[in-house]
């Protein structure tokens, strides 16, 4: 299954939340639906359908392909701890996700492009793999040649650098990943237990 590149509002509407980031079109469609008394009711999903939908939501949210997500779940299952929580922590430590959490990009898709286009370094070395697993203590920065790009100034204007306690800012476009976040700190509205149940069948 290839990475989804179609209309993102359509997918976000399916899950009822802006899983790809701020979405003005989604807000407008929700308002319209709320004012439509004759809008069709959603069909009740089966247990399997609910579990599958939660996995799909997690995949779309973090921008993973089916094989990537399956492999990450297998890794989470092999590590100590609660599998669902470990899965969420592995998703959070991906380089593209941390670039997004730093505010350098407004969506994870944009963060992924920054990484693949060689704008990002880890401990001073360019890393162009979005799935790179960042370790606590590593420093993520924008390359020297890219620091002058206006998009970083625009994206970081008014950004709350204290928003995520596991990311410690070093300078305007550089931060340290200080620790693995606890599940309760991860803001994504994902029921990881449903994903565990899906893969346990």
Curated annotation (Swiss-Prot):
Gene Ontology cellular-component annotations: small ribosomal subunit
Keywords, sorted A to Z: Ribonucleoprotein, Ribosomal protein, RNA-binding, rRNA-binding
GO molecular-function term, one example from the UniProt record: structural constituent of ribosome
Domain S4 RNA-binding stretches: 93-155
Quaternary structure and interacting proteins, as annotated: Part of the 30S ribosomal subunit. Contacts protein S5. The interaction surface between S4 and S5 is involved in control of translational fidelity.
Role this protein plays: One of the primary rRNA binding proteins, it binds directly to 16S rRNA where it nucleates assembly of the body of the 30S subunit.
Listed CDD domains: S4
NCBIfam families per UniProt: PRK05327.1 (NF003717), rpsD_bact (TIGR01017)
Species this chain originates from: Elusimicrobium minutum (strain Pei191)
InterPro entries on file: Ribosomal_uS4, Ribosomal_uS4_bac-type, Ribosomal_uS4_CS, Ribosomal_uS4_N, S4_RNA-bd, S4_RNA-bd_sf
Keyword Membrane: no
HAMAP family: Ribosomal_uS4_B
Biological process annotations from GO: ribosomal small subunit biogenesis; translation
UniProt superkingdom: Bacteria
Gene that this sequence comes from: rpsD
Protein known as: Small ribosomal subunit protein uS4
S-S bridge residues: none
Annotated family: Belongs to the universal ribosomal protein uS4 family.
Entry-linked SMART domains: Ribosomal_S4 (SM01390), S4 (SM00363)
